[in-house]
Amino acid sequence: MDKATELFPVLETERLVLREVTNKDAQQIFDYLSDEEVMKYYGLEPFKTIDEALDEISWYQSLFNQKKGIRWGITLKEQGEVIGSCGFHNKVSQHYRTEIGFELSRKYWGQGLAREAIEAIIQYGMEYMTLHRIEALIEPPNLPSQRLVEKLGFTREGLLRDYEFTKGKFDNLFIYSLLKTDVEN
């Protein structure tokens, strides 16, 4: 049974506050989602307008409202502005399973912030969303994301051939999983 509340949960770590993203955050979302390097493996073209950022925020809100997932804005405690996001989507409640996604402004790469945020949401997902399995689908050339999930205990299960059609082409994706039993052990 899902113990998550109707209110959007705010999570705190040593350096971060993970919170709901609102339309007030559109400029910050646009700033990093318009960066080609950030969007390289995101499945979308770099954003060209603020309306695309507002559409992304609307998608985040629909995940939570429809109980299909949740997406947190990643903020530094002392700043408050959104520097990335992370969360769950494609939640399948009857199978206690979801997919994880994350991205971070390039300015903050290599500082351990994504790992800190993802550790917090995994703990939340296992405890309050009663997840048993979290999947990560990652393009083979995206080595930094592969290393990150491997450090967090995810296991690569295989290659999903031509699994996604994005940016006018089919992409292979590695499928990784983290089970609640992996975390407990």
Residue spans for each PLM region:
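Generic hydrophobic, helix-prone segments enriched in Leu/Val/Ile
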Residues: 5-8, 47, 64-65
